[in-house]
Design a protein with these regions (language model features):
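N-terminal beta1-alpha1 cap of cysteine-dependent amidohydrolase-like domains
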Residues: 1-203, 209-253
Length: 253
């Protein structure tokens, strides 16, 4: 509604993007890739399990390399991080994967959180409304420009979003990923847990660990989704300017 566009959603089975599908079902494989290659934007949502994740990574790689707007939610953010680790940082498999997919070793790009004990899935998720602090020198962020941030106790700009996940980016690899251009622009209060990724020189390549849809409303759309749709429609600058103008008007005296 905010963008005044009619949204057309094309569902793609990520398994059909994988090489095995080309051999087993060529028609499904080529249709899936046609849908990805002709999409105005690519969204990889949250989820659990390994099924289809290699195909999701291929879709994320396509978006990253071809300037197609990308939004990764929860697992979708982790997929983008793994793809970047493999294809840009050249971190080998199995390190460049998730403990959710391969738990034989703790040295993984995506690891289980201290709150989560492998093998005990009940009641172990990181849930609820939690702060995400914008990191220094992230003022360039397209996503940040859309948010009306509050200020934390130490004066740092922050947002509040709801979470639902068991796995997170391994902090030991953050510096390596950032050195190649993957920016971790939002973190939790400790600075250890990674909440938001964004590529600077891309029309819109954003991943968030939280679930912004939980707080989205018809007249107050979630900023990650709003930015993604606006970028896909070629009107991100217009929407951002409107948001900035509204924020300025609301803070004027």
């Amino acid at each position: 509604m905010r963008c005044k566009k009619k949204l057309k959603i094309v569902w793609v089975d990520a398994e059909h993007l994988e090489p095995e599908s080309e051999r087993a079902n060529p028609a499904a494989y080529h249709k899936a890739w046609h849908d990805v290659c002709t999409a105005s934007g690519i969204l990889v949502p949250g989820g659990f399990g390994q099924r289809g994740t290699e195909g999701m990574m291929k879709a994320a790689k396509w978006a990253r390399e071809n300037g197609t707007p990308y939004l990764g939610i929860c697992l979708g953010m982790q997929i983008a991080v793994i793809e970047f680790a493999r294809n840009v940082c050249n971190i080998p498999v199995p390190v460049s994967t998730s403990q959710e997919f391969d738990a034989r070793d703790e040295d993984r790009i995506i690891i289980s959180m201290p709150e989560h004990h492998p093998g005990q899935l009940g009641g172990t998720m990181r849930l609820g409304l939690r702060p995400t602090l914008w990191q220094p020198d992230s003022e360039w962020s397209r996503l940040r420009a859309l948010y009306a941030s509050t200020t934390s106790a130490d004066g740092q700009s922050q947002i509040l979003e709801r979470h639902r996940h068991r796995y997170e980016v391994n902090p030991n690899y953050v510096s390596t990923l950032e050195s190649k251009g993957l920016n971790f622009i939002g973190k939790d209060e400790t600075g250890v847990r990674q909440e938001i990724i964004e590529l600077k020189d891309h029309p819109w390549f954003v991943g968030v660990q939280y679930h912004p849809e939980y707080l989205s409303r018809v007249l107050h759309p979630s900023k990650p989704y709003l930015g993604f749709i606006a970028a896909s429609a070629g009107m991100l600058d217009t929407i951002t300017a409107e948001i900035v103008k509204e924020k300025t008007a609301n803070t004027s005296f």
